[in-house]
Amino acid sequence: KGPALLWSGDYALAASGIGALGQEALDELTNGRQIQLNFAVEEDAFEWSAETRPADLADQLRLFATKLAQPGWDPAPVERLKLGLLTGFDQQETTPNGLIDRDLIGWLRGDDPRWRSPTREEIAALTPASFRAFWEPLLKSGPIEVQIFGDLGTVDIDALLASTLGSLTPTAAPGDDAPRQIGFPAANSAPRIVRHRGDACQAAALLAWPTGGGAGAMRTGRQLEVLAAIFNDRLFDRLRAQDGASYGPIVASEWPQGVDSGGYLLVGSLLAPKDIDRFYATARDIVRELATTPVTADELARNAGPVREQYARALTGNLFWMYLLEGATRDPRLVRAALFIERDIAEVTPADIQRLAQQYLTSERQWSLVILPEDRGPR
């Protein structure tokens, strides 16, 4: 209800203070200590996070608890956010990359107001009062999940939790009318056209398909990552081989953990306007090949190996485990999915890759978008 101001939280909510203490006062209190207050909007939750150390953990938890119990509403961070967004708004429209950085997630989620970037008018309409009216009830709603990873041998974690987050007044469950689905743009036979106001030699092309999401099918999400790696490898080689085009295409798969929708496989590249048709033709050739001809064992191993190694490195760190287990107290399937990541990737077969290409990368589900300079007419 009312304006969707999720975009305003990442910076201004953490910086708006606690009670009567603004950010400067908090900085003075935590000077020389490893205490943080970071905020993020996830697919199905709001997240406060920090990297700290055992000696500072007690006060770190007190900071979280006090922020939830007595949030501050210093207007200065809201005004700084507003000024910064308005100042950079026009600059972002001078390059294809600027528009992608700002608008890609909104495009891929069907311009859902929860995810799309704000318009200039929406930014200009932001006030400290509207910011507080939007965020204050949200901070008071929903259950709180706590995750702590690290060396806790010298810490009485049960006592710390009981005296901080555990002492908060129970919060009301969120209303059931909140949309739990994440959308995707309607398929199109011709690319959507977006204009930038920069160099006439710069453009970008995007191609995407919806996939899925959810903890119950994380194995499919891992398999799609391997498919994306194979697609990326082929696309990179072919674009470089064609007239020496020096582009850096990217193919990425996204599979949300907390909701059963919103996943996608995205293919994109910055390029010259004259090369857009060639890019799409090459990408569609690869799609057709993946769906009709199984990849070789060598190609599969060459691309699955780096994906598995990347996970193996990430799994040695606390932050990655926190990411993997977000929501696990509500959905224990996430624990099992986290424990079997490397096995899921190692067991991907050529038949899996072909099946996924046939299932997801179809023309009936395909969405595309091009970013062209303003002086280029419709294609």
PLM features: what roles do these ranges have?
Residues 351-358:
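Low-complexity, intrinsically disordered Gly/Pro/Thr-rich segments
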Residues 237:
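Long, His/Glu/Asp-enriched segments that create or flank divalent metal/ion-associated functional microenvironments
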Residues 1-14, 18-70, 80-90, 94-123, ...:
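M16 family metallopeptidases and their MPP-like homologs
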Residues 145-213, 372-379:
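An aromatic/glycine/proline-enriched structural segment found at the starts
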